[in-house]
A protein has these predicted regions:
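Sec/Tat signal peptide C-region and signal peptidase I cleavage site
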Residues: 20-27
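N-terminal (or domain-start) structured segment
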Residues: 27-119, 158, 166, 179-210, ...
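Hinge/capping helix and adjacent helix->loop/strand transition within the periplasmic-binding protein
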Residues: 58-61, 82-94, 106-196, 245, ...
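Hydrophobic core
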Residues: 14-20
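Bacterial N-terminal signal peptides that target proteins for export
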Residues: 1-12
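Surface-exposed, polar/charged faces of alpha-helical domains
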Residues: 154, 270, 277, 294, ...
């Protein structure tokens, strides 16, 4: 009887060993083929540039080719709607980029978008680019943020700020100021890329621009632009002498463009860990880091609970501002 029991124990142990080994081998074989990386914008934008620069390094880390495809439209939602429905089996070799705070436009009830943060499988953050407000160097009306705010209050709806699209990080930064700084009312020019913003500023169609640090640093070095503030929790390493919005005004106006990589919802944890580890390994490649530094793009390696908590807090802030209800 003892012998039979002992035989069963041995059999179970062997069976479990076989299952464990098979699972391990299967995990080690992932990915089995090329990875598709989806950019939710048309070719030529910042995320597209980053994706194409990053792809060869991720390919090396994974040991398989990485193909970048563009799926623009709907302010990112043509692609994001598909990402939220990716099948963990059929789409296990597909990853995509999600941009914040742009993706949080789902909070706008007018969009009737049923997706939310829980609709996505976030792997890891990749890069973060704080916003900044800039004016023309030498503008006698204002050269500091307190001067700018005071002038706006004294001249409501007379100052024009050029920003990106409606609901973009640039727009939300201005909307936050309108919501929480009494008397701060400005006109806005929407839908401009950064080059167009500068044309409007230099041509005096706009009095100020809202954008991301990475694009404007080279123009600041030319001595044509005066940064009023950085809209981050800390000062930027690229602009160490420029105060944060909070330092200069006492208002906690934090806004930025952040890029996060996602995989199919429900993807097995072991596969998600392989992808996350490879992405972060590629980000740590010295050559890649230098190339992003030259482009003034700040890498942002955060995952798991910290990433989810960060995004949840951001969604709460956007929900309080309700930029969609403010005057355009």
């Amino acid at each position: 009887m003892y012998s039979n029991f002992q035989s069963k124990v041995v059999f179970i142990a062997v069976a479990l060993s076989v299952v464990f080994t098979a699972t391990k081998i299967k995990a080690e074989q992932y990915p089995k083929g090329p990875i598709t990386m989806v950019v939710p914008w048309k070719p030529g934008g910042g995320t597209d540039r980053t994706a194409r620069l990053f792809a060869p390094y991720l390919s090396k880390a994974l040991g398989v080719p990485v193909k970048v495809i563009n799926m623009g439209g709907g302010g990112g939602w043509v692609a994001w709607s598909k990402m939220a429905k990716w099948d963990p089996k059929k789409d296990d070799h597909t990853i995509g980029w999600v941009n914040f705070p742009h993706m949080l436009s789902y909070l706008n009830p007018k969009m009737k978008n049923k997706n939310n943060l829980d609709s996505f499988n976030f792997l890891t953050g990749h890069s973060i680019d704080p916003c900044t407000w800039l004016v023309r160097e030498g503008d006698k009306r204002f050269q500091t943020l307190p001067e700018f705010i005071a002038y706006v209050k004294a001249h409501p709806n007379k100052i024009t700020i050029s920003v990106g699209g409606f609901g973009s990080d640039d727009h939300q930064a201005v909307a936050f100021a309108e919501k929480f700084i009494p008397g701060f009312k400005v006109k806005k020019i929407f839908g401009n890329n950064d080059a167009k913003k500068l044309q409007e500023l230099y041509g005096k169609t706009a009095d100020a621009v809202g954008g991301n640090i990475s694009y404007f640093v080279p123009h600041m070095l030319e001595g044509k632009l005066r940064p009023l503030a950085v809209l981050g929790k800390q000062r930027s390493n690229q602009l160490p002498t420029v105060p944060t919005f909070e330092e200069a005004s006492g208002v906690k106006n934090y806004n930025f463009a952040a890029r996060v990589l996602v995989a199919a919802p429900g993807l097995p944890d072991e596969k998600g860990k392989v992808l996350t580890a490879a992405i972060q390994k590629a980000m740590d490649t010295p050559e890649y880091g230098i190339r992003e530094l030259r482009g003034h793009n700040t890498l942002w390696k955060v995952d798991g609970t910290k990433l989810k908590d960060f995004l949840t807090a951001l969604a709460a802030t956007v929900g309080k501002v309700k930029f969609w209800d403010l005057p355009k």
